[in-house]
Swiss-Prot record:
Name this protein carries in UniProt: Arogenate dehydratase/prephenate dehydratase 6, chloroplastic
Main EC class the enzyme belongs to: lyase
Encoding gene (name): ADT6
Signal peptide region: none
Biological function: Converts the prephenate produced from the shikimate-chorismate pathway into phenylalanine. Dehydratase that uses arogenate and prephenate as substrates. Utilzes more efficiently arogenate than prephenate.
GO MF term (any one): prephenate dehydratase activity
Organism expressing this protein natively: Arabidopsis thaliana
Transit peptide: 1-44
Length: 413
């Protein structure tokens, strides 16, 4: 099947558009127009968007567009994934784990049926894979070796969606991913909250007293630090790219002095034993993921929605109080506020006749609030915010994850 390009129809749209579909597209156009109005003051940020990105082999012409038909990489093989009988939410890779996508693999791929292709960072057995399965139960999960690759997989039509962790209830925000949300032009179309159940894994026959190091993702290490100390594991901690990757590394290198912090599913895939189960410091350990797509969804008011924005001001953080008051005045609850350094202007120099020259850090502010962009109060709040800011961008307006969860219902499968 011909690879999708900028002129290709919407993925899976093999039938002529119905009247309902035309109405939906019209609504999406109106929503995109609204976003364009709210993000009109983004001249400085557009300059940053033009910064060079790491070259992608295979002759990709455009990164953020879809004109990449010439970027085919010989030998690329995206194999349909066999579903697990024990857990239908995640694919089965026990006998033949998929190789994660790398920068050199970013070329258009053929469609495989009607299932969504969802990119995630990590290898089979990663928590991001479980989040992809929870968000899209019938998806074809595509492992990627970097978060950047997951973004580009969607931009280049290799994947239809990406699932990205942004914060954890114990470890806090994943700052790298907030930076990527700003650098790329994907839209947040949903969120999913996943309880995290960590296990201590090692090769069969290995005992805890023989361990000399524990490896995992930095968040995994941070989330289990106190428990490891209580277990007497005062050994070296080493960070790797992801939790399941740590398990794979131990298995592939036959490391009998090393343990990994990962899921029970990773132990099953890579043939490891569980030395300790449930080693997270807090049983209510939850990671929040966002779902990303090339196009925004049409916001609604018939269910709880959340909206994510990012803004900055050329005169520093003094505008923050005014921005927050725009939401407080309209009784809009904020669920998150996060500051990140402004990479375009990291330092602001201020000359004052009384105190001399001072240097201040410049920040971008990420805010999540509980309201839909279809609501007048949200539109009015952002119109007021735009008056106070030099840069404002709506990252997405999307349904909140209202799925109940229990600390005992882990993602260990």
């Amino acid at each position: 099947m011909k690879a999708l390009s900028s002129s290709s129809p919407i993925l899976g749209a093999s039938q002529p558009a119905t009247a309902t579909a035309l109405i939906a597209r019209s609504g999406r156009s109106e929503w995109q127009s609204s976003c364009a109005i709210l993000t009109s003051k983004v001249i400085s940020q557009e300059e940053s968007e033009s910064l060079p990105v790491p070259p992608v082999s295979g002759g990709v012409d455009h990164l953020n567009g879809h004109n990449s038909a010439a970027a085919r990489v010989p030998g690329m093989n995206l194999v349909p994934i066999e579903k697990s009988d024990s857990n239908p939410l995640v694919p089965q890779h026990r006998h033949n784990p998929l190789k994660p996508l790398s920068m050199t693999d970013l070329s258009p791929a053929p469609m495989h049926g009607s299932n969504l292709r969802v990119a995630y960072q990590g290898v089979p057995g990663a928590y991001s894979e479980a989040a992809a399965g929870k968000a899209y139960p019938n998806c074809q999960a595509i492992p990627c070796d970097q978060f950047e690759v997951a973004f580009q997989a969607v931009e280049l039509w290799i994947a239809d969606r990406a699932v990205l962790p942004v914060e954890n209830s114990l470890g806090g925000s994943i700052h790298r991913n907030y930076d990527l949300l700003l650098r790329h032009r994907l839209h947040i179309v949903g969120e999913v909250q996943l309880p995290v159940h960590h296990c201590l894994l090692a090769l069969p026959g290995v005992r805890k007293e023989f361990l000399t190091r524990v490896i995992s993702h930095p968040q995994g290490l941070a989330q289990c630090e106190h428990t490891l100390t209580k277990l007497g594991l005062n050994v070296a901690r080493e960070a790797v790219d992801d939790t399941a990757g740590a398990a794979e590394f131990i298995a592939s290198n036959n490391l009998r002095d090393t343990a990994a912090i990962a899921s029970a599913r990773a132990a099953e895939i890579y043939g490891l034993e569980i030395l300790e189960d449930g080693i997270q410091d807090d049983v209510s350990n939850v990671t929040r993921f966002v779902m990303l797509a090339r196009e925004p969804i049409i916001p609604r008011t018939d269910r709880p929605f959340k909206t994510s924005i990012v803004f900055a001001h050329e005169k520093g953080t003094s505008v923050l109080f005014k921005v927050l008051s725009a939401f407080a005045f309209r009784d809009i609850s904020l669920t998150k506020i996060e500051s990140r350094p402004n990479h375009n202007r990291p330092i602001r120099v201020v000359d004052d006749a009384n105190v001399g020259t001072a240097k201040h850090f410049e920040y971008m502010f990420y805010v999540d609030f509980e309201a839909s962009m279809a609501e007048a109060r949200a539109q009015n709040a952002l119109a007021e915010v735009q008056e106070f800011t030099s840069f404002l961008r709506v990252l997405g307006s999307y349904p909140m994850d209202m799925t109940p969860w229990s600390p005992t219902s882990s993602t260990s499968s």
